[in-house]
Amino acid sequence: MKKVFLISLIVLLVSCVTQPQKPIPTEPTKASSGEIILLGKINKANLQTSDITLWFEKQYHEISADPQWGKDLQPHLKGLKIKVFMGTWCEDSQREIPHFLKLLDQIRFDQNNLEIYAMSEEKTTPENFEKGLEIYNVPTLIFFRNKNEINRFVELPVNSLESDISKIIKGESYTHSYE
C-alpha cells in the first residue's frame, strides 16, 4: 500500500512540473523603418531567446513585483484567456510586456491560455490575428472569458500595471487610457 501511494505521489509531482516553453518558429523580419522585428505569433520563449529582443530579459529581471500582488486573483483565473498584441520595435511594449509576463508568472497563469502576437509598425500581422479586434496602439492586452472580451489594457497604465490588471481580472470597473 505504501509503495502504491509513493508511486502515485511521484507521478503527481512529476506531472505538475511546468515544462519550459520552446520558441514558436519565426523569422525576424525587416520593418518598414528598416528595423529588424519579430512578426506574427510568438511566445515568451521567443522574447527570451531572440537576438533582437535583448531588452526583454534585462527588463524582466530588473522588475520587482510585490510578492503579495495577485494572491486574491486565483479564483478569477478560471476560464480566463489573454491575447497580447505588441511590437518588438515599440518602447511601450518593451516597458510593459516584461512586467506583464512577470506578473503572470507570479500568479502562475497557465501559458496555454496566453497568446502573444508581434505586430508590424502598421499594427498588422501577416496572418491577420488582429482582424476585428481594433488594435490601434501597442501593447494591447485583451482579456477573454467564455470567448467574450471582458476588458483590455491599452499601451500604458491608468494607475499602475498591477492595479489595472488586477481590476480587469476581477471584473471590476476599469477604463483603459484611450476610452
Per-region residue spans from a language model:
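Positively charged n-region of N-terminal signal peptides that target proteins for export
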Residues: 1-4
